[in-house]
A protein has these predicted regions:
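Catalytic-core regions of glycoside hydrolase
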Residues: 1-80
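C-terminal functional modules
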Residues: 76-180
């Protein structure tokens, strides 16, 4: 419905500029989440599609991989499957640690437009219902996965150079969480 409406207003097929995973409006964040939001039936309704990546070329590849997958075959696009494939392809020697990093670096935080991304730290809310143990497990996993990524930097040096400050922060957050 949205694409039909906008195309009617434009008098032509729309060109989509996806402003993701760009983080110029939330520079303290890495936007490593799944790429979603467009209908799977719009392939015949658009004239083109492009993305606005982050200033971090390697880290942007998580989303760009999915965008390429989506634009190649929109009706069959699966955001979760594509995201998992991107993670495995980009960090083949530590995919689980990289997945943990990515799923804990999703949300934009507070912005002027109020948009929030779904899926940030999916295991963290469990502690709100079950007491301290899930939090302890979460923080221990944070430290372990961050340490694994930092130790694996020889296998994906360009990626680790870009995400290292956020990986180190993830490790420190985990350590802090364990001491509280």
């Amino acid at each position: 419905d949205d694409m039909e409406w906008i195309n009617q207003q434009l008098g032509r097929k729309a060109f989509i500029w996806l402003n993701y995973p760009v983080n110029d409006y939330c520079q303290s964040r890495m936007l490593m989440g799944k790429t979603y939001g467009n209908g799977l039936d719009i392939n015949e309704m658009v004239s083109g599609f492009c993305s606005n990546p982050m200033e971090y070329a390697e880290a942007s590849k998580v989303s760009l991989y999915s965008i390429a997958d989506d634009t190649w075959n929109m009706p069959a696009y699966d955001a979760t499957s594509s995201w998992n494939q991107a993670i495995a392809a980009l960090m083949p020697t530590a995919p689980e640690a990289f997945r943990w990093f990515c799923e804990n670096n999703v949300d934009l935080g507070k912005t002027g437009h109020g948009l929030r991304r779904e899926g940030e730290s999916p295991l963290f809310p469990q502690g709100q219902e079950a007491g301290w143990k899930p939090y302890e497990d979460f923080f221990q996993k944070q430290v372990a996965e961050a340490s694994l990524l930092l130790a694996d930097s020889i296998n994906s040096p360009e990626m680790l150079t870009e995400i290292k400050p956020w990986v180190e922060s993830m490790c420190l957050q985990g350590l802090r969480g364990l001491t509280v």
